[in-house]
UniProtKB/Swiss-Prot annotation:
Residues 224-300 are annotated as: Transactivation domain. Residues 211-222 have a biased composition (Basic residues). The gene is bel1. Residues 89-200 bind DNA. This is Protein Bel-1. InterPro entries: Foamy_BEL. It is found in: Host nucleus.
């Protein structure tokens, strides 16, 4: 917000109810019947214009609050006071609402877009507020599909229902509108022009989704192991010694005989091609058949 623009005051004393009187805080010179005026601080930069509110009362700065805390340490701390929505400025309330509806990155993205953010109380549910985004070029209005609620227990803005993934997001609609925006505001002389399509009430829409929507079953992260197809799962075939292939055509013996004929090192080649002597000795299993040893290592 521009520092030269006027800002609505945070004119509330709900957090100071434990104090005796306001005249004790600001001094007897300001305890009159008129509006409360806090003494102005000396201006460091005389060129900077003063910031006045609509009531011509200067906004209370952090330093003024700090002085009051130092003078009255036994009272409640003003920095611990959390303002309610009606006590917030519009800019602060807008940012807190967007952070309640979206993440911080999405809220920053919305604030950078050429839309003005506003909200109004829902006629269906007085506790809910409908957030609207108005294009600054063509005055098109986009309603957020998720209402926002003020949680008085924790004093923060929250979503009406945990259904953001179902009802959708307004960010995608705003991006789509930016690409197709006509950049021309509707003419006031032709009120018979096209009107925006009526949207469903976001509160009723969220209630309908919550009532009729059935969530999908979540997938398990761990893969289920099929014990019947696993060779090391207690299957008796895995513990039996013998040839791994019953088809004699794929055994190395006939293949080597066709290539080398009768050779002196044919048995050694068969052993190496079937897994080697180490495999035969330790696992007691090869494609040549049952081992010729004592069988102590025939079973894992």
């Amino acid at each position: 917000m521009d520092s030269y623009q006027e800002e609505e005051p945070v004119a509330s004393t709900s957090g100071l109810q434990d104090l005796q009187t306001l005249s004790e805080l600001v001094g007897p010179e300001n305890a009159g019947e008129g509006d409360l005026v806090i003494a102005e601080e000396p201006e460091e930069n005389p060129r900077r214009p003063r910031r006045y509110t609509k009531r011509d009362v200067k906004c209370v700065s952090y330093h003024a609050y700090k002085e009051l805390e130092d003078k009255h340490p036994h009272h409640i701390k003003l920095q611990d006071w959390i303002p309610k929505p009606e006590e917030m400025s519009k800019s602060i309330c807008k940012r807190l609402i967007l952070c309640g509806l979206y993440s911080g990155e999405k809220a920053r993205e919305i604030l950078k877009k050429p839309f003005t953010v506003s909200w109004e109380q829902s006629e269906t549910n007085p506790d809910c507020f409908i957030v609207s985004y108005t294009c600054i070029f063509c005055d098109a209005v986009i309603h957020d599909p998720m209402p926002v609620v003020w949680d008085s227990e924790v004093e923060i803005w929250v979503k009406y229902k945990p259904l953001r993934g179902i009802v959708g997001s307004a960010v995608f609609i705003m991006e789509k509108h930016q690409k197709n925006c006509s950049l021309v505001k509707p003419s006031t002389s032709c009120p018979e022009g096209p009107k925006p399509r009526r949207r469903h009430d976001p509160v009723l829409r969220c209630d309908m989704f919550e009532k009729h929507h059935k969530p999908r079953p979540k997938r398990s992260r761990k893969r289920s192991i099929d014990h019947e197809s696993c060779a090391s799962s207690g299957d008796t075939v895995a513990n039996e010694s013998g040839p791994l292939c019953t088809n004699t055509f794929w055994t190395p013996g006939p293949v080597l005989q066709g290539l080398l004929g009768e050779s002196s090192n044919l048995p050694d080649l068969e052993v190496h091609m079937s897994g080697g002597p180490f495999w035969k000795e330790v696992y007691g299993d090869s494609i040549l058949g049952p081992p010729s040893g004592s069988g102590e290592h025939s079973v894992l």
